[in-house]
């Protein structure tokens, strides 16, 4: 039996390109590709290839990606991740709420893991924000939403004058609420955990914030940071399984750091369908999971 997969994704790096090429060669799959930055719709006549798909897989890039998932929900079309799951991952505040609820529910199981202090705030009144932020420094200001790379930022505030730099650099965002995390002093490394079904992978790389603190570059291309394998522990595998179940995620990743004053891990970010850069031959696992998921529907 041949299953039709409607795959909405930008072919912008080798992992995705290899997954697509492998799915094209699979005798059990008919693959329809959609680029959310180029392929748009006549809304009263959505394509049959979408309506008749056995599975819709979306690697979210922009609002067009979200629109597809809304359409799928309205017409009860099968998706790898549904719109509610993706919207939760997109919204850092809602995701924070959900993660804290998970930590509370599994507090006896997740003793090895922490969440940093966090807040939502506004910089519409900069003086008021500075007064609020001063006793909490250092902090990291993050964009409220995370799927659109043109509207996404992580900004370290060590001293209160750094707020002025943020306001100058991101002045178009001052009327929006932002997500703020306590800055976690760590060993300078960032651990990235990737999950595909019941398979869990790990890499470690230099933390971009620590690169900035050391070198003060104008920009940091995180894709060029060297990555090494990280041995995934049973505690991390169990944590991954809990996140998958509670957040209804099949393919996802999360970032952790190791605070200097404890042997625990602090989770600082989570994404649906991440890049998987640095995992050898991961395209094989992704292809097999997506293919098998479609065949088992």
Go through each PLM region and give its residues.
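Conserved N-proximal alpha/beta basic substrate-recognition cap immediately N-terminal to
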Residues: 10-121
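Short glycine-rich anion-binding loops that position phosphate/pyrophosphate groups of nucleotides
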Residues: 61-63, 144-146, 273
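C-terminal active-site "lid" helix and adjoining low-complexity regulatory extension at the edge
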Residues: 245-249, 258-297
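Extreme N-terminal starter segment of soluble prokaryotic enzymes
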Residues: 1-6
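A short glycine-rich, hydrophobically flanked beta-strand micro-motif that places a catalytic Asp/Glu
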Residues: 181-182, 191, 249-261
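Protein kinase-like catalytic core scaffold
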Residues: 139, 179, 201, 252, ...
């Amino acid at each position: 039996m041949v299953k039709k997969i409607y795959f909405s994704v930008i072919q912008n790096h080798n992992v995705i390109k290899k997954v697509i090429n492998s799915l094209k060669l699979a005798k059990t799959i008919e693959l329809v590709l959609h680029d959310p930055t180029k392929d748009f719709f006549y809304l009263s006549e959505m394509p049959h290839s979408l309506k008749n798909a056995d599975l819709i897989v979306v690697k979210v890039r922009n609002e067009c990606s979200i629109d597809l998932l809304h359409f799928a929900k309205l017409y009860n079309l099968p998706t790898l991740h549904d719109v509610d799951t993706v919207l939760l991952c997109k919204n850092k505040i809602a995701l924070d709420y959900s993660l804290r609820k998970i930590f509370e529910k599994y507090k006896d199981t997740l003793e090895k893991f922490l969440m940093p202090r966090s807040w939502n705030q506004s910089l519409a009144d900069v003086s008021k924000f500075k007064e609020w932020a001063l006793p909490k420094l250092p902090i990291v200001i993050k964009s409220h939403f995370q799927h659109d790379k043109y509207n996404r930022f992580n900004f370290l505030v060590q001293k209160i004058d750094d707020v002025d730099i943020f306001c100058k650099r991101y002045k178009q965002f001052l009327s929006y609420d932002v997500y703020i995390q306590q800055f976690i002093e760590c060993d300078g490394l960032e651990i990235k955990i990737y999950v595909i079904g019941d398979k869990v992978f790990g890499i470690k790389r230099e933390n971009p914030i620590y690169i900035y603190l050391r070198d003060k570059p104008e920009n940091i291309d995180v894709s060029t940071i060297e990555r090494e394998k990280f041995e995934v522990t049973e505690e991390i595998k169990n944590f991954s399984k809990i996140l998958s179940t509670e957040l209804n995620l099949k393919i996802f990743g999360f970032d952790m750091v190791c605070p200097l004053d404890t042997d625990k891990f602090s989770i600082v970010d989570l994404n649906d369908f991440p890049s998987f850069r640095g995992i050898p031959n991961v395209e094989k696992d992704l292809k097999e999971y997506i293919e098998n998921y479609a065949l088992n529907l």
